[in-house]
């Protein structure tokens, strides 16, 4: 059984028919380094779209290449010189043990999937199937590091990865579908949805619903944008961030902004304050959710090539928030 594997070659967005709103969400995720969850029915294309994210990301910087190479050396992974600048993508199976996910093991320290994905993508397909093992993930996302206890000594491995995950809305996959009847009871749907910890849902900035593509769209000869074109916009947004954060230690993307940096770089105008005041009241947003919306809006403004976050950027950011679970 394969427990942990690379993600394979990136999928070109042009291969995916329709799903324009999902593609836009992936563009925003790539531009700002935001975590993303794709939810949809069976065969809706969730995994294909998740794999497309890697093709939108810029290459590793020289500093990042060295950091990734050090982890690969510790894990005794063979280096591919031709792909040294390509961001890693690791896709562990739900059957993977905690040690395979998070690191550890008897004898020498072995980096887990979260560290092997450092400065790249951690792809968790069928997220609810990982079950209780997901409990450690929120703290790792916050710290961007993995702490491994061995013989009373804490060892720290880097784990600054971008999470991209997929899930069905319920065990059978048809909850909320207009064409297929869901076979699950409300209680079963609730138990399934709650297998993704609330703390983890809260840390995922972009939640995307992936509908099944209808026959007309599926058989249309119309092609969407290739990943290379989208990646150019992502690269331009990343360059804006690199300039902005040149003097800010340990920050390379908007997703990594701390509170002080949010205050400095995510200021709102009067219309923006009015919109967010209404959103906080109507959606009962926590302080953490509020700050994540600002980070995301900063990325959307960067994609638009503007310095000031406006109401349109905030409105799009709010659309990516998680829907309430049952």
Model-derived regions: residue spans:
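Peripheral, non-AAA+ core regions of ATP-driven protein-machinery
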Residues: 1-36, 149, 290, 307-326
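A short alpha-helix capping/helix-coil boundary motif
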Residues: 2-7, 77, 116, 256, ...
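Conserved ASCE/P-loop NTPase catalytic core
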Residues: 11-194
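Basic, amphipathic alpha-helical bundle interface domains used for macromolecular binding and assembly
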Residues: 109, 131-326
